[in-house]
């Protein structure tokens, strides 16, 4: 039998009573299970009498195991019976007496109740998309940069030049001065082919530890193609005017996508900020762990451990700010997730089979696998979560459409 003793926000205190006959059956099952695994001198494995096994293991230890076993068995039944959706729980009281039932009290962090703000009255302050001629000209200039060629020049190296060098060890490699480390750039600027220069090598503290004798073999500069009909045709445009129109249309599509994404972001942030909810600490801690795991993965790709990164922040006196920012970001993400979930519950959009299949195909492309492989990897529960995400996406789009 289970009953709610006390409820305060997300925190629910629950009492569970297990009848004596079930306690007895669980104890006997526990003994049999242990007897099959515990070695008792003078008996073959699994053949020792239960009383002998009980004496060998000790009554107190067995009763502790029994309590844990009973909680594992009955807690899921209790929360289902009471209609709770726990995100965390801990047992705070236990009472197990000889020949009697087992009683325990658990403090449950229940999934929070959520109330949305009046989102239909939202005014989203997002600037409409705009594509200017200056933006078109800039995009065309970027195209010229992309199709530029490196050509040798007989002069001193300048800021954006590329140098081909050889070190005293015989290693030859190119250096882009625009991307070079400041001390390397400073050493090579103004040098020409045939010059020999001593390039400093710095340690992690920025201190010079040695110099490398380096010879400049060649200086090259970027030669941009002329913005003319010929250049347009290399990009499969019919004319220069056609190229400009294509660039303009591409920028408009990008601006429209950015506008829609900004509207959605502004809506969700506003929805989350106005959410009436008391979030269980365990949900926030779980999201903080999730964020740290992602950070650790990013750092690992850079050859840095999370521990070293946190230690460096501590040395700089920035660890507390990092932890505070982490908590704020975790809360923001949890609030947005709860807001999306509640909005989908409120609007209850339907996901057609056609929409679902299209979504699966898009997800498979993003993961670089076939749809059937995606289904197998995600499994039934993963696919259910994916479908719920699609349903929530639809709810957000419906809300944005209603706002106009």
From Swiss-Prot:
Instruction: Give all residue intervals belonging to the PPIase FKBP-type domain.
Output: 160-225
Q: Write the record's keywords in alphabetical order, separated by commas.
A: Cell cycle, Cell division, Chaperone, Cytoplasm, Isomerase, Rotamase
Top-level taxonomy: Bacteria, Thermotogati, Deinococcota, Deinococci, Thermales
Q: What is the name of the protein in this document?
A: Trigger factor
Q: What does this protein do?
A: Involved in protein export. Acts as a chaperone by maintaining the newly synthesized protein in an open conformation. Functions as a peptidyl-prolyl cis-trans isomerase.
Q: Which family does it belong to?
A: Belongs to the FKBP-type PPIase family. Tig subfamily.
Q: Name one GO molecular function term.
A: protein folding chaperone
Quoted from the entry, the domain comment is: Consists of 3 domains; the N-terminus binds the ribosome, the middle domain has PPIase activity, while the C-terminus has intrinsic chaperone activity on its own.
The encoding gene is tig
Enzyme Commission designation: 5.2.1.8
InterPro entries recorded: PPIase_dom_sf (IPR046357), Trig_fac (IPR005215), Trigger_fac_C (IPR008880), Trigger_fac_C_sf (IPR037041), Trigger_fac_ribosome-bd_bac (IPR008881), Trigger_fac_ribosome-bd_sf (IPR036611), Trigger_fact/SurA_dom_sf (IPR027304)
The GO annotation for biological process reads: 'de novo' cotranslational protein folding; cell division; chaperone-mediated protein folding; protein transport; protein unfolding
Q: Reaction(s) catalyzed by this protein?
A: [protein]-peptidylproline (omega=180) = [protein]-peptidylproline (omega=0)
Q: State its location(s).
A: Cytoplasm
